[in-house]
Amino acid sequence: MNAIVENCPDKVLLADETRYGVLELQGRGVCKPADKTSSSNWMLAVAAKHDSMHPFIRFSALKSCSADDIGEALALLAGRIDTLVVDGYAGYVSLMDGILQGIKRQCRLVHARREVYAASTSGNLVKALLELSPEERVEHFRKNMRDGRNDVCLLAVLAGFQLIFGYEAEVAESLPDETEEAHAARILTHRQTFVKPVYEAIDAIFMEMAKTQTTQVKGRFRSKEDTQAAKAVRYWMNQREHLKVFLEDGRVPLETNTVERAIRPMAVLRKNKGFVQSIDGAKTLAMCMPLVETAKLNGIDVEELLNDMSKAAFKHAYEKQWTYWYTNEEAPKNPTRKIQDWANMAELLSDFNWADYLPWVWKARKEAEARLQAELAKQAAPQMA
């Protein structure tokens, strides 16, 4: 999977995490160590965007959700991407100042919308509005917006989000023969024209609400009261600078649906199984699951891909070892045994071209071979007749 990430040309990637217990790390089960290292373990997923020409999903087993553990898993991205789309977890802040320095962080706008939706539907306002006529609703909004009522302000914000996502849907699909760069430029122009004014209006409402709903401590906003409205305002104010990156880059999505969908099978497995016993088990799971999910994203048969890759890898190791045996007097007497020794396979495959078996490369090659076979069969048909 590292080869897939290293060879993916995408400059904007998505990340998400989900809990997955490892008993060995929690000091429980038959594999428990002498000391517990963490009471909560995680799986971190990194994926390409939904419209990427090089879709993939990569999992990493984490001892904890600390910035150090996440940073170790994401170190591979340093210097490879421009923007990472994540949630509002504070650990990502230190990463962008450290190991991922130079990479921009876009917080999911869809998460901000969820916070506002939860706050808007937690009271009786929606129920009361449904009992009013359209004219009475307009008057209700006009009066309460002037008074700065939180519930009405949040409904206005929710309407703004609906506009933003509606505008985004208008340019979501690329045009025929449109390049990725041209599509991103068209999206950016659309956002600057239509989305930015709405976003700025939403930001102005939150800035005003923050005066009564939050307090600032050491650069972070905290809720004054334990209410859904205060939580929504706090989330926006703390992530404010990282929610608007998409306004300057048409490649950056507003959501992370791809990685959330890809991580769902892991969550289902956790619900049914509960945990893995050992660290090795967690690493194996993190290695196998993304192979299947990446194959699904690329529309290919993972078994066929792995068979082709395994045959090519073994052939490479076999030919390399026998060539060494023929050309070196110090070679072992039985080179075949060394080929079958897994301890030496990594060395034998050190110069194997894994890039030929990237899902999108392998798929393109298979499609080209199928077209060639069809053309040859078409040419041979008249001769056989």
Residue spans of the language-model regions?
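Catalytic center-proximal scaffold of phosphoryl-transfer enzymes
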Residues: 1-385
